[in-house]
From Swiss-Prot:
Domain Chitin-binding type-2: 213-273
Keyword Cell division among record annotations: no
Coiled coil: none
Protein name: Uncharacterized 29.3 kDa protein
Compositional bias (Pro residues): 32-192
Length: 279
């Protein structure tokens, strides 16, 4: 029974709260229409102050009547407080009229016209162009340099000697024939080097090879080629393309510079060998 009783109490409380909520909603819905018309008239007077700047450009005394219309909006605000006690949320729109004082700074632009006369003095420096006549004398000196160019034609005869150097290049072709004599030095016996002597006991190619082998390896700067004394055109090379002590014939092998006109003495041949003479 106690449980049922408590349930009934809860149901009653819920019903009461619902009823209160609905009644409050109805009151709120009915009352907002009243403040809604009030804000509409209040903004309408605010645009009216905009015409007030128009009188300011005309005479300066006109700004004095502008304060007189300012009290007229104040009675329009007086009816607005009457709805404010009816609803607590309405005070939020009431601050909106505060922007109305903002138009009052509009008279401050009036000083701006006063600086406008200040630019007028800027034209006063315009008399400065008076120095412009002074540059006019400067053109008068310019004719004076004109006589100076007249001596310039006098150097013109000096270029006439320039043709005289032209004959000098003609001797330059004379050195060009000098290169042809350069081929003449090859026949000289200078590449032969100093003659080298070998013992008279050496009489065959094998004996000569055995005699030359230590000479190819032992000297600090070993000779590369040696002439065979019993053959005018045969040369013994220490290392002929990695072949040790290879015999080369000057007339047949193109690896050497040689004369192919028969057997000639070693001192006349241009083969790069060192002649060997018998002791």
């Amino acid at each position: 029974m106690v449980f049922l009783f408590t349930l009934l109490n809860y149901i009653i409380i819920i019903l009461l709260t619902l009823w209160l909520l609905t009644s409050l909603k109805q009151n709120i819905e009915t009352k907002p229409p009243l403040p809604s018309p009030t804000p509409t008239p209040t903004p309408s007077p605010t645009p009216t102050p905009t015409p007030s700047p128009t009188p300011t450009p005309t005479p300066t005394p006109t700004p004095t009547p502008t304060p007189t219309p300012s009290p007229t909006p104040t009675p329009a605000l007086s009816p607005t407080p009457t709805p404010s006690p009816t609803l607590s949320p309405t005070p939020s729109p009431t601050p909106t009229p505060s922007p109305t004082p903002s138009p009052t700074p509009s008279p401050t632009p009036t000083p701006s016209p006063t600086p406008s006369p200040t630019p007028t003095p800027s034209p006063t420096p315009s008399p400065t162009p008076t120095p412009s006549p002074t540059p006019t004398p400067s053109p008068t000196p310019s004719p004076t340099p004109s006589p100076t160019p007249t001596p310039s034609p006098t150097p013109s005869p000096t270029p006439t000697p320039s043709p005289t150097p032209s004959p000098t290049p003609t001797p330059s072709p004379t050195p060009s024939p000098t290169p042809p004599p350069s081929p003449t030095p090859p026949p000289s016996p200078s590449p032969l080097g100093d003659p080298m002597y070998f013992p008279s006991s050496v009489g065959t190619t094998d004996q000569l090879r055995d005699y030359i082998r230590p000479l190819c390896n032992g000297w600090p700067r070993p000779r590369e080629t040696y002439a065979v004394p019993w053959d005018c055109q045969r040369v013994m090379h220490c290392s002929y393309f990695s072949l040790p002590l290879h015999e080369v014939t000057c007339n047949d092998d193109s690896a050497y510079s040689f004369t192919a006109d028969g057997c000639v003495p070693h001192y006349q041949s241009d083969c790069p060998f060192y002649p060997l003479n018998t002791l």
